């Protein structure tokens, strides 16, 4: 409620480019006709995917949940219809000449979106819910975009971005292309959002050959009970197996992401984070022969606090 009151309009993220065109057309038509700001807002509200908070009356229950949602003007749709880019080739194209800042930036790399949406169903994840269904981008288009974007920016790293990079069906082909295309040019390939149960050892081993880096996995919760609550879909056996595969592939640095304050969390769940990290560290010494170890294993554990997000099963969950 408090956020909506500060916005004249809100656009559906997935199709902002398409909605901008329709919105600008409505703005120009209203200006040409000498219409008022309210006339423009009324016209904008009729564009599928645009929400104009001032044209709706929302009532709330005592617990803060929505009791009713209704338009206040004739012609304004009762519901704002979600808009989607279905064909990623026809309706979407990556920015091939992104702005390069004059100062050192944290995200100093090319970001290439390889797919949109996620095949998983983690109950805390807003993006995984609102960007359904999963839509992959054509691998040949991605190859050309990568080539052009790196040439235009001069960056030395490219991030293959998605909600779950290892679920992209053409990942191996794309990574092989990037390694061959930029061989000898010291271009690092970053694969964020890896699922430990979909760890592609052959792909990651090739990436590791380009530039040594640590691996990041996100079990999210330390206990099996809590992972089941959030629908993470990971068992301890799968986690340890995936970590073992990474260690056998030559890694000795692993980052682990967890969340605190998840719904139904107990003290035992929090202690489970330390226990799981310890078991992963022990796995390194179990699967890697002493003569093949590259020093001690490094397990870095990072935690963040759960924040309930709209449009997720946990949207009304309290924060601890």
Model regions and ranges:
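Conserved structural-core and active-site-/substrate-pathway-adjacent residues in large, well-folded domains
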Residues: 1, 9, 50, 117-118, ...
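Conserved SAM/AdoMet-binding glycine-rich loop
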Residues: 147-305
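Iron-sulfur (Fe-S) cluster-binding segments and ferredoxin-like electron-carrier domains
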Residues: 125-141
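Short glycine-enriched, charge-decorated loop/helix-capping segments at active-site entrances
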Residues: 129-131, 229-234, 315-320
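N-terminal [4Fe-4S]-dependent radical SAM core
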Residues: 53, 59-111
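Gly-rich Lys/Arg/Thr-decorated short loops/hinges at beta-loop-alpha junctions or inter-strand turns
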Residues: 101, 122-130, 221-227
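N-terminal pre-triad scaffold of radical SAM enzymes
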Residues: 96-123, 150, 191-192, 213, ...
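Glycine-rich beta-alpha loop elements in corrinoid/cobalamin-binding modules
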Residues: 1-70, 310-320
């Amino acid at each position: 409620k408090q956020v909506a009151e500060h916005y004249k309009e809100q656009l559906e993220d997935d199709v902002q480019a398409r909605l901008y065109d329709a919105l600008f057309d409505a703005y120009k038509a209203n200006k040409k006709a000498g219409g008022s700001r309210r006339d423009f807002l009324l016209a904008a509200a009729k564009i599928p995917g645009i929400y104009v908070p001032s044209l709706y009356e929302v009532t709330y229950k005592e617990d803060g949940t929505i009791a009713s949602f209704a338009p206040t003007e004739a012609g304004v749709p009762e519901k704002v219809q979600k808009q989607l880019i279905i064909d990623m080739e026809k309706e979407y194209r990556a920015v091939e000449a992104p702005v390069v800042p004059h100062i050192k930036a944290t995200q100093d790399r090319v970001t290439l979106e390889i797919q949109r949406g996620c095949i998983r169903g983690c109950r805390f994840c807003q993006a995984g819910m609102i960007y359904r269904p999963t839509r992959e981008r054509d691998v040949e288009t991605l190859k050309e975009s990568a080539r052009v974007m790196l040439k235009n920016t001069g960056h030395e790293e490219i991030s293959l971005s998605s909600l779950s990079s290892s679920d992209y069906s053409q990942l191996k082909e794309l990574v092989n292309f990037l390694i061959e295309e930029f061989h000898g040019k010291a271009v690092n390939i970053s694969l964020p959002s890896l699922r430990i149960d979909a760890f592609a050892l052959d792909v990651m081993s090739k990436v590791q050959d380009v530039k040594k880096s640590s691996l990041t996995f996100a079990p999210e919760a330390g206990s099996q009970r809590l992972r089941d609550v959030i629908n993470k879909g990971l068992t301890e056996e799968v986690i340890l197996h995936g970590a073992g595969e990474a260690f056998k592939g030559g890694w000795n640095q692993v980052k682990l992401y967890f969340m605190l304050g998840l719904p139904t969390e107990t003290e035992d769940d929090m202690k489970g984070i330390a226990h799981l990290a310890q078991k992963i560290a022990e796995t390194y010494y179990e699967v890697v022969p002493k003569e093949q170890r590259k020093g001690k294993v490094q397990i870095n554990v990072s935690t963040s606090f759960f924040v309930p997000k709209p449009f997720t099963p946990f949207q009304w969950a309290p924060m601890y």
